[in-house]
């Protein structure tokens, strides 16, 4: 019962993260009108890392722990924390950077759909690594993919593959590896500290790349300050940290299915903020993604067992009542 409760809470945390990411998409789109990709990623990651430092301190205080750099005296846990944070930082940097480059050569709809290829990559890589995926998981993957296709690809006849599409798929592969790295380390490390390290790594790499490949200037940065703040504190600092915390109690193959809600929330954000209209195709896509999440999270064998037990108990109660009535009549 306690395990189910933790799983439900973690799912709600991950859904909250996807809602933040979906609404942050509008802010990020606005920021790209003023600053370039590496500058945007670097600044928002730096802001996220700084934001998480007091969060770590408050978390330790609430737990009654002494505030230290690593949060543990165990050398093995320190090593895992640093390695997990380093790997997460590298993979999220590579994934988001390739995505920003790839989106210049493809449509937004196709980019959104191809990015969600991590829905397939995560269970396939898990299978290669020897982890079993139940039937529900595979059914949910297929349903979610169909939903994402309807949501993101508006013109069926024009679906062709170009350089941008290939880059988006490669980006999705690195997002999948990022999810699996979190799954590997999160059970025995502090998730908030790991997220903080992740963003310091991402900030350093992206800002170095920004000064090499781009021409960042203060005027443009000030023009995009609200979008950077929103993306840094909420999308990165809160959203990605909620993802890491949630993955403690959610199987790796279910995580990307829930994360696919990001596209649903970005669509809702477009309707609310930009007054965009939602087509019947997009509505069906949203419904299919919700169905996929329910299928992935539901243990149908357990439900069937409970249903059979309830029926058996009801039949037993009826038989006992009949026997009691017969004795009364005698």
Where are these predicted regions, by residue range?
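Glycine-/small-residue-enriched transmembrane alpha-helix faces in small-molecule transporters
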Residues: 1-43, 89-90, 94, 98, ...
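C-terminal-most transmembrane helix of multi-pass membrane proteins
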Residues: 3, 7, 45-46, 53, ...
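Hydrophobic alpha-helical transmembrane segments of multi-pass integral membrane proteins
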Residues: 8-13, 39-58, 83, 137-143, ...
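Hydrophobic/small/kink-forming positions within alpha-helical transmembrane segments
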Residues: 19-22, 26, 53, 89, ...
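Specific transmembrane alpha-helical segments of multi-pass solute transporters/efflux pumps
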Residues: 24-25, 56-115, 150, 232-250
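Hydrophobic/aromatic residues within transmembrane alpha-helices
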Residues: 31, 40, 44, 102, ...
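Helix-helix packing/entry segments at the starts of transmembrane helices
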Residues: 41-43, 111-117, 182-203, 236-272
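Hydrophobic transmembrane alpha-helices of multi-pass small-molecule transport proteins
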Residues: 52, 133-153, 172, 206, ...
